[in-house]
Every structure is written in C-alpha cells, then in structure tokens.
C-alpha cells in the first residue's frame, strides 16, 4: 500500500498543495484532478521519488520509500507526461532496453496491444505523437511493477485506445495492482470504480 502523509509542495515560493494525505491500496485506480497549476505533475513526481516535497513523506508498505530505493524502483513504474522513449531507437529496441528480461514474443504482443504491429522496427522519432505515446504505454503490458504512476497517459490516444488502456488498468487492479494517473480526458462511463482526488492550494479538496 502507498501512503502519502501530510505532503506540502511549493514552487517559486507558491504553495501548490499543503498537508495532503491519502492512501492507495491494492486494486485501487486513483485519478488526480485539479486546474492547471494545482500541482498534479508535481505530486506524481514526488510520489515516484523524482522530486522532494517541502514536508511530508511517502510510505510503501509502511516503510519510507527513501529507505528502500531498490525495492521501490522494482515495485513502481512511472511514465511522465512526455513519452520518455528514445527517438533514435525503434519501438522494439526501446522495449528491449526498458524490459531486458522480456522475450521478443512478449514485446511483439505488447506492441500489438497498442496497435503498433508493423511499426516494430520504425525509428521512434519518425512516428506520430500518438504512436510515440503508445510505445511508452506498451510497457504496461510488460511491467511487473505493482504500482503504476502515470502522468497524462491518454494524451494523443483515440477513443478506442483509451478504452483498451482503461481495460488494462482494470486488469492490473484486478490482479492486486494499483494505478495513479492524471488525465484531461473524460474516462469511459463504465469506469465508475476510479477514485478521484482533487487538488487545491489547501491540499485535497474532494475524494470519492
């Protein structure tokens, strides 16, 4: 279980959120909401261990993540708002790099899940923004991490792709995994199982 305890985040002397606390357990899908500038990306980076809060701490299974970095890196997958893939490599080469323990068959299957069959050997820099995003999202079919932290994973993805990715989120949660995401897109109607946390300058405003 992930526990955020009394997190405060400030940028350029402006408090983005203060005393923010919540938990994310096995099987949870949590959407972080809020207006632009509320600190959604900053929160995800703090949760992933890429930034430090002004105060507060992150616990994973009741232990501070800073005390178990190696375990945390295995248990957590972070995908930022940029695709985060290597433009000079192909989709196949990217996934081999990020998931060296996976077979080519597994990688081809993952690329098929995100509709990139036929693009395995293309240069990523020559793909569209949506295709580059899907190369990154193919990692969701390969990762063994229990917690996924995803910043705008649905950007440049069409409606059918959104539904498939949300289905993968649900499958991951059904296996006891957890998902934390931000998105500006409306989620499919059937995804009423998604918990929502809304950020304001005072921290968590609403959670349901």
From Swiss-Prot:
Single GO cellular component term: plasma membrane
Record family assignment: Belongs to the ABC transporter superfamily. CcmA exporter (TC 3.A.1.107) family.
Membrane topology term: Peripheral membrane protein
BP-aspect Gene Ontology terms: cytochrome complex assembly
Name assigned to this protein: Cytochrome c biogenesis ATP-binding export protein CcmA
Chief site of localization: membrane
Species of provenance: Tatumella citrea (Pantoea citrea)
Quaternary structure and partners: The complex is composed of two ATP-binding proteins (CcmA) and two transmembrane proteins (CcmB).
Top-level taxon of origin: Bacteria
UniProt-annotated binding residues for ATP: 34-41
Biological role: Part of the ABC transporter complex CcmAB involved in the biogenesis of c-type cytochromes; once thought to export heme, this seems not to be the case, but its exact role is uncertain. Responsible for energy coupling to the transport system.
One MF annotation (Gene Ontology) recorded for this entry: ATP binding
EC number: 7.6.2.5
């Amino acid at each position: 279980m992930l526990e955020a305890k009394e997190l405060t985040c400030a940028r350029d002397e402006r408090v983005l959120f203060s005393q923010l606390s919540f938990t994310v357990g096995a099987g949870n899908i949590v959407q972080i909401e809020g207006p632009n500038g509320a600190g959604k990306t900053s929160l995800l980076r703090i949760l992933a261990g890429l930034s430090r809060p002004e105060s507060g701490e992150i616990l994973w299974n009741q232990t501070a993540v800073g005390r178990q970095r190696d375990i945390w890196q295995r248990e957590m997958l972070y995908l930022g708002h940029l695709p985060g893939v290597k433009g000079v490599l192909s989709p196949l080469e990217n996934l081999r790099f990020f998931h060296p323990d996976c077979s080519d068959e597994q990688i081809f299957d993952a690329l098929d899940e995100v509709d990139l069959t036929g693009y395995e050997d293309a240069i990523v820099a020559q793909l569209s923004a949506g295709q580059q995003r899907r190369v990154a999202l193919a990692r969701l079919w390969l990762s063994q991490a229990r917690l996924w932290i995803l910043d705008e994973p649905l950007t440049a993805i069409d409606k059918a792709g959104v539904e498939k990715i949300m289905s993968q989120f649900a499958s991951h949660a059904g296996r006891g995994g957890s998902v934390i995401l931000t998105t500006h897109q409306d989620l499919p109607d059937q995804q009423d199982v998604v918990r929502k946390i809304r950020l304001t300058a005072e921290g968590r405003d609403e959670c349901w």
